[in-house]
């Protein structure tokens, strides 16, 4: 039984639907959100359903910032580390906003609507901070910044059967929408819906943006559940979203990335375009690279009994603290106890043995490749 929602906690338009479905609700970054659905078997079943079939996630707590105007591209280029000039209209890009010292304000997905119109999708826990950051750092550009966060219900349809599920409700040929591209079309009778082939589960799938009124949101959610019935669809909560993203080494703000971690340390430099011109954090990152990276994000697998959890200490074999676990869990699909952790570079080689302090006891762990899961390539 869930306690009543406190007055100051925010709710998505689907809140009543989650509660009526018996979801276990938690306070997540000030939002009353479903962590799992005991009625479908909870986190483990949800995780496995997304890997094999399809799961539905309410991700309406995420933020949406529109940057538009004659200097929109210049503004986005200055705000983010990837090269938005390479985007075609209808294409999305993983990127990040950085502080002047090269650490993370937040990671973002940049969507290009037009040459003068972009949408930044940001994290729930950093919404207000991010909106203020964008406004404060684009004053020198001819742009308008709009916080659209409360205008949309955002539903993620994730898993290999996500495309088949959504296809039943739309006139858009989804097979023509490539990964990290988006389009607009009719979904469940709603016109002009943003349909993006994106997600946070290391699986194929889509995210749709619909009007944020409760009646519309509830209807579309239930129609998606009905459409996915033959594929074993389940409603899924933040618990399985976390284990799914962890299997795929997708970073989470406050864990793998934060205002104390720079891009080199996080291993996200493949999204860093130093040659595109000036952007916030560029000079500091150049210096950090020349100075040499001192720590690295690695994968760990315990080789003794114990599950590494977020925040646990990483020790060397003499018992000295050398780092910490950013995210860790038993992985339902892989059936392994795995974690991501920051350790000194000299301790980061594959197969190196360290220890994780679990319940005040050192438990041996091996450094393993950090992308634990890669989705299978589709056969032609």
Curated annotation (Swiss-Prot):
It is an enzyme of class 2 (transferase). The keyword Transit peptide does not apply. Signal peptide: none annotated. Its EC number is 2.1.2.10. It catalyses: N(6)-[(R)-S(8)-aminomethyldihydrolipoyl]-L-lysyl-[protein] + (6S)-5,6,7,8-tetrahydrofolate = N(6)-[(R)-dihydrolipoyl]-L-lysyl-[protein] + (6R)-5,10-methylene-5,6,7,8-tetrahydrofolate + NH4(+). InterPro entries: GCS_T (IPR006223), GCS_T_bac (IPR022903), GCST_C (IPR013977), GCV_T_N (IPR006222), GcvT/YgfZ/DmdA (IPR028896), GcvT/YgfZ_C (IPR029043), TrmE/GcvT_dom1 (IPR027266). The keyword Endoplasmic reticulum does not apply. GO terms for biological process: glycine decarboxylation via glycine cleavage system. SUPFAM superfamilies: Aminomethyltransferase beta-barrel domain, Folate-binding domain. It comes from the Bacteria. One of its GO terms (molecular function) is aminomethyltransferase activity. GO terms for cellular component: cytosol; glycine cleavage complex. It holds the Pfam family GCV_T. Keywords: Aminotransferase, Transferase. The glycine cleavage system catalyzes the degradation of glycine. The glycine cleavage system is composed of four proteins: P, T, L and H. Belongs to the GcvT family. PANTHER family: AMINOMETHYLTRANSFERASE, AMINOMETHYLTRANSFERASE, MITOCHONDRIAL. This is Aminomethyltransferase. It comes from Koribacter versatilis (strain Ellin345). The lineage of its organism: Bacteria, Pseudomonadati, Acidobacteriota, Terriglobia, Terriglobales. The gene is gcvT.
């Amino acid at each position: 039984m869930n306690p009543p929602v406190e007055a100051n906690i925010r709710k998505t338009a689907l809140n009543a639907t989650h509660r009526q479905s018996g979801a276990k609700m938690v306070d997540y970054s000030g939002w009353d959100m479903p962590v799992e659905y005991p009625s479908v078997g909870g986190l483990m079943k949800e995780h496995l359903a997304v890997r094999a079939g399809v799961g539905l996630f309410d991700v309406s707590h995420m933020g949406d910032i529109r940057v538009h105007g004659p200097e929109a591209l210049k503004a986005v280029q200055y705000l983010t580390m990837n090269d938005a000039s390479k985007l075609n209209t209808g294409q999305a890009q993983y990127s990040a906003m950085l502080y002047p010292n090269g650490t993370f304000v937040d990671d973002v997905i940049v969507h290009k609507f037009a040459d003068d119109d972009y949408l930044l999708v940001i994290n729930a826990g950093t919404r207000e901070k991010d909106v203020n950051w964008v406004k404060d750092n684009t004053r020198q550009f001819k742009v308008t910044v709009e916080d659209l966060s409360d205008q949309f219900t955002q539903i993620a349809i994730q898993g290999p059967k996500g495309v088949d599920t959504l296809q039943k409700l739309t006139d858009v040929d989804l097979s023509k929408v490539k990964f990290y591209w988006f389009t607009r079309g009719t979904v469940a009778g709603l016109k002009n819906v943003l349909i993006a082939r994106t997600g946070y589960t290391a699986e194929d799938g889509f995210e749709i943006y619909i009007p944020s009124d409760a009646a519309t949101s509830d209807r579309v959610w239930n129609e998606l559940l009905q459409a996915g019935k033959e594929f074993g669809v389940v409603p899924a909560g933040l618990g399985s979203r976390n284990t799914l993203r962890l299997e795929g080494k997708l970073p989470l703000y406050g864990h793998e990335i934060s205002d104390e971690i720079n891009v080199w340390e996080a291993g996200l430099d493949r999204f860093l375009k130093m040659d595109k011109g000036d952007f916030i954090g560029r000079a500091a990152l150049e210096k950090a690279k020349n100075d040499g990276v001192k720590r690295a994000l690695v994968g760990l697998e315990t080789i003794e009994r114990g599950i590494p959890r977020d925040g646990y200490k990483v020790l060397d074999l003499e018992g000295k603290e050398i780092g910490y676990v950013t995210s860790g869990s038993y992985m339902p699909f892989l059936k392994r106890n795995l974690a991501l952790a920051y350790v000194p570079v000299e301790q980061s080689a594959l197969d190196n043995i360290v220890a994780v302090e679990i319940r005040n006891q050192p438990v041996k762990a091996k450094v393993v490749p950090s992308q634990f899961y890669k989705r299978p390539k589709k056969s032609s």
